[in-house]
């Protein structure tokens, strides 16, 4: 009798994979962590998305983050993501979802040219993308004021957002910030924790778009979205 295929031996429906994975993470998380039940749920989903239990010890949740985030999502506040990968990872949402890296391009296609963002001179490839994200954050300032910022890739996006906050130009209801990398990511997230704004973040160089999406998806589930 031929041996069962690898797919037959190991593959499971997506829902069953998620159920088993979350149960395994729940069993592995410390029982006396100090998290509320809601915060524990979002930490659990972030660990699942990362496939790394060590992430649990790096997650930082502002005391007002869950309450403020749930209120904003239930009110259908705008969600602003830094890159498309974060937006693509989100559950269905009845409010608006904007992507900063696309914001300038959308503004230039506006029906009234006088409302469009001015064109910028060409820059080197890496710098051009970083600048475009920062300009997109600035262009989406009205959406960010009272909205939910979800930054999973670009430290530049978080730094630009913090500059807006410091200048008194916007006050997000919640910032989910997990930019990843060895340059500016840890510093940007540390700057975030120094400000009195509701946030969910991951200390150090770890992070990424899947973690940011997982954190917000946990809140969307809790909000009944």
Ranges and model annotations:
Residues 26-34, 48-55, 74-78, 95, ...:
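Generic secondary-structure signature for well-ordered alpha-helical cores
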Residues 78-88, 151-158, 180-184, 205-210:
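Gly/Ser/Thr-rich loops at beta-strand to alpha-helix junctions
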Residues 78-137:
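Glycine-rich, small/polar surface segments that engage phosphate groups of diverse ligands
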Residues 82, 176-177, 215:
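Buried hydrophobic positions in well-ordered alpha/beta secondary-structure cores of metabolic enzymes
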Residues 96-101, 169-178, 198-202:
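Short hydrophobic/aromatic-enriched beta-strand-loop microsegments
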Residues 124-188:
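Long, charge-patterned amphipathic alpha-helical coiled-coil/hairpin "stalk" segments used as oligomerization
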Residues 173, 183-225:
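C-terminal functional extensions of proteins
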């Amino acid at each position: 009798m031929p041996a069962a295929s690898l797919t037959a031996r190991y593959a499971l429906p997506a829902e069953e994979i998620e159920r088993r994975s979350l149960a395994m993470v729940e069993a592995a998380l410390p029982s006396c962590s100090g998290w509320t039940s809601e915060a524990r749920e979002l930490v659990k989903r972030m660990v699942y998305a990362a496939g790394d239990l060590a992430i649990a010890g790096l997650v930082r949740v502002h005391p007002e983050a869950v309450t403020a985030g749930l209120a904003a999502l239930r009110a259908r506040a705008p969600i602003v993501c830094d890159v498309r990968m974060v937006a693509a990872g989100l559950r269905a949402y009845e409010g608006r979802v904007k992507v900063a890296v696309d914001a300038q391009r959308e503004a230039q296609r506006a029906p009234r040219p006088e409302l469009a963002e001015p064109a910028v001179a060409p820059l080197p490839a890496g710098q051009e993308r970083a600048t475009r994200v920062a300009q997109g954050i600035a262009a989406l300032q009205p959406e960010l004021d009272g909205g939910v910022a979800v930054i999973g890739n670009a430290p530049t996006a978080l730094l630009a957002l913090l500059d807006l906050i410091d200048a008194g130009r916007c006050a997000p209801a919640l910032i989910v910030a997990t930019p990843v990398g060895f340059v500016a990511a840890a510093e940007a997230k540390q700057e975030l924790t120094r400000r009195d704004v509701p946030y969910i973040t991951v200390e150090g160089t770890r992070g990424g778009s899947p973690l940011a999406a997982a954190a917000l998806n946990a809140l969307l589930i809790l909000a009944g979205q």
